[in-house]
């Protein structure tokens, strides 16, 4: 006994024993927190949540899951509104996702809506939660006071991810004064919602009244809204918002964001009483946002392609104009507007918009007193570079809203002090032949110019028309394009000529340019980051033009004094790129033994991608036998993908041939819908691959 006692007093041995105890405890806790659970429509919440004995409800799983947990939900319909009471951590997030190769449906049919409520609710101080691969659908209200939402995130937190979901049929039946959202994020605290990611989702068939399809509002920082497909909704597609009183004073701007790779179409307020039955819904909107990059997006058949401004003239109750990195502000009373500021809009395609392609400035005159949501805001240091615009302003407008305003619209409260820039853009006007439309007169309050324009290429099928093609500060009598250049001092290096698109008559239109195009090497690389916003954490921290063009090719050629850049969204490769669609089927492994499995992946890629992302479905075929049909979800503005697990038990011994059949996709004429859908990308089949069972 004496000997053993003395041995245990040896400090090295004591430390070793303690270490083993701590290690054992840590391993035990890790095993608990990194748990894997399962939910099934045939389960029971009294079960342990294993794959063999799953739970019945997603809510029970949410109540149970702690940091590090992963919850797999088997396919089926779950009629519930799910709240997440716990947070994950950066190293141990909480993940909820459909089981591999399946899609679980969260359906709101018949469920009540209380206040603002989602089918997915991440409310309060919540961090590191991922929701992936669900269909979220059918949630509605008849009450003006209630707001149904597909995904509702509010409060503060870090690292929330909403990935690869299909959100649809979220509606308010009282659109004149009501609201609904597809995905909505409200930062309501001095602590932001930050490192948010909304990616790979399809959001469609929404009736949102006075609200948006997807938004971030208030104190939301360092967010990414990327590679989503948003379509057939009756209000704004993606909106980054400030000054609405969602966040505290000085913390009320959605800022430091990346909105890229999205395809948005058929977005219009013309059938929405909440929008006054007008063509006023934006595909992309910076409404009081700050330091946001919009790039590599395709916007077609929206009312406005993109608008950067602020709807508010008095940003906060104490007159705070904006918060900055140090939360400083400037008074914003009266004629000094709030701004959508430091928005960089680059390498996008905007076409067939109903009212306007690109727009800056407040939609109404600022008043002497000023007020919230009066349209009296404006745009500050917003830079539009290397975009391609075609045939925008396709609708004549109506008595309440006036006529269409063409490709580039300049509204109110903008002048030389605001520093807005429009360069290196291809502007090809449609039937109304309006290239530039500026409401802004030359005044002392907002002295000319309302924006700096240069190095653009303008054209239209009808050619330049005096009194139509350019309206600038209530002056429209520019007899020729050169007369416009001389009298205004704008567009000194711009040209009026045919850009030589590869094929406007193809479906979709091919906006890449021929090798002989006048856009080649004709742009400018003279703008520095000091004139606008270059994301220091993005792909091009030192260039306002971006690192790649719309298709992902290098944005510039050469270096130093020999560097050049094309005009428009595409950098010419020296080869005329015809429209093409590629379906590719791959597998992680091509040889399986009994008991093994692999994952099949189909990608559908469009080039040069004028129709945006290929959507629809893909059929995984084993010989002539259908394994499963899966929905495609976007991975960029020109590519989508679907996956399916494949087990050895599904194969015959020896070589097995697999292919993937793409359905194709169509887009209806809009807006309103005025005919049958038009095929954008036709059906196609992948090359076969072989899986061998040994």
Residue ranges and their predicted role:
Residues 41-79, 83, 119, 484, ...:
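Acidic Gly/Asp/Thr-rich repetitive segments characteristic of extracellular carbohydrate-active
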Residues 29-60, 75-77, 100-102, 500-505, ...:
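Right-handed parallel beta-helix/beta-solenoid
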Residues 78-84, 108-119, 140-149, 171-181, ...:
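Short glycine/acidic-rich loop motifs that flank beta-strands on beta-rich extracellular proteins
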Residues 74, 93, 97-103, 127-138, ...:
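Right-handed parallel beta-helix
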Residues 457, 482-571:
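C-terminal accessory segments
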Residues 1-33:
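Sec-dependent, cleavable N-terminal signal peptides
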Residues 59, 63-67, 79-95, 104-132, ...:
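Extracellular beta-strand-rich solenoid/capping regions of secreted or surface-exposed proteins
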Residues 576-694:
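Solvent-exposed beta-strand/loop surfaces, strongest in extracytoplasmic domains of secreted
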């Amino acid at each position: 006994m004496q000997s053993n006692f003395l041995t245990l007093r040896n400090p090295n041995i004591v430390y070793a024993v303690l270490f083993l105890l701590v290690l054992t405890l840590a391993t035990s806790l890790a095993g608990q927190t990194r748990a894997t659970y399962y939910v099934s429509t045939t389960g029971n919440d009294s079960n342990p949540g294993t794959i063999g004995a799953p739970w019945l409800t997603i809510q029970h799983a949410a109540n149970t899951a702690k940091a590090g947990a992963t919850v797999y939900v088997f396919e089926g319909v779950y009629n519930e509104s799910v709240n997440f009471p716990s947070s994950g951590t950066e190293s141990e997030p909480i993940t909820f996702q459909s089981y591999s190769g399946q899609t679980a449906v969260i359906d709101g049919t018949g469920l009540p809506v209380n206040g603002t409520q989602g089918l997915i609710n991440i409310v309060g101080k919540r961090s590191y939660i991922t929701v992936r691969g669900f269909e979220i659908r059918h949630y509605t209200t008849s009450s003006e006071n209630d707001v149904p939402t597909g995904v509702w995130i509010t409060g503060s937190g870090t690292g929330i991810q909403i990935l690869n979901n299909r959100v649809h049929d979220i509606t308010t039946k009282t659109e004149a004064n009501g609201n609904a959202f597809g995905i909505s994020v409200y930062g309501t605290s001095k602590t932001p919602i930050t490192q948010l990611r909304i990616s790979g989702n399809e959001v469609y068939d929404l009736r949102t009244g006075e609200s948006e399809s997807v938004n971030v509002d208030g104190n939301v920082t360092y967010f990414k809204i990327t590679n989503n497909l948003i379509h057939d909704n009756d209000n704004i597609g993606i909106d980054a918002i400030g000054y609405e009183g969602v966040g505290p004073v000085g913390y009320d701007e959605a800022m430091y964001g990346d909105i890229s790779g999205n395809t948005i179409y058929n977005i219009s307020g013309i059938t929405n009483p909440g929008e006054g039955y007008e063509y006023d819904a934006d595909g992309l909107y910076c409404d009081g946002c700050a330091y946001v990059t919009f790039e590599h997006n395709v916007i077609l058949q929206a009312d406005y392609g993109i608008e950067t401004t602020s709807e508010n003239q008095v940003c906060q109750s104490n007159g705070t104009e904006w918060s900055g990195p140090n939360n400083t502000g400037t008074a914003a009373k009266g004629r000094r507007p709030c701004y959508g500021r430091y928005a960089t809009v680059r390498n996008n395609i905007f076409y067939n918009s109903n009212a306007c392609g690109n727009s800056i400035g407040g939609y109404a005159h600022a008043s002497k007193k000023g007020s919230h949501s009066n349209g009296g805001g404006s745009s500050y240091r917003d830079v539009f570079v290397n975009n391609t615009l075609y045939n925008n302003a396709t609708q004549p407008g109506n008595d309440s809203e006036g006529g269409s305003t063409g490709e580039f619209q300049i509204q109110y409260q903008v002048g030389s002090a605001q520093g807005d820039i429009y360069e290196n853009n291809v502007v090809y006007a449609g039937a109304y032949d309006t290239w530039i439309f500026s409401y802004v007169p030359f005044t002392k309050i907002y002295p000319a110019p309302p924006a700096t324009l240069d190095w653009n290429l303008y054209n239209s099928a009808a050619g330049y028309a005096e009194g139509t093609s350019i309206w600038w500060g209530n002056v429209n009598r520019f007899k020729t394009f050169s007369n416009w250049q001389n009298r205004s001092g704008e567009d000194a290096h711009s040209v009026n000529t045919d850009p030589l698109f590869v094929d406007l008559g193809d479906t979709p239109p091919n906006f890449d340019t021929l090798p002989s195009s006048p856009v080649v090497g004709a742009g400018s690389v003279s703008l520095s980051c000091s004139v606008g916003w270059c994301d220091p954490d993005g792909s091009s921290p030192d260039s306002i033009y971006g690192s790649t063009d719309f298709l992902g090719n290098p944005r510039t050629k050469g270096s130093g004094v020999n560097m050049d850049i094309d005009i428009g969204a595409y950098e010419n490769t020296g080869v005329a790129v015809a429209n093409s669609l590629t379906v590719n089927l791959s597998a992680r492994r091509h040889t399986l033994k009994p008991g093994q499995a692999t994952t099949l992946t189909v990608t559908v890629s469009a080039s040069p991608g004028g129709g945006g992302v290929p959507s629809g479905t893909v059929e995984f075929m084993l010989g002539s036998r259908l394994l499963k049909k899966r929905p495609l979800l976007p991975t960029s503005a020109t590519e989508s993908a679907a996956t399916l697990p494949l087990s050895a038990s599904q194969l015959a011994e020896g070589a097995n041939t697999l292919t993937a059949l793409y359905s194709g996709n169509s887009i209806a004429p809009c807006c309103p819908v005025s005919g049958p859908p038009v095929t954008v990308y036709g059906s196609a089949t992948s090359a076969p691959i072989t899986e061998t069972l040994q």
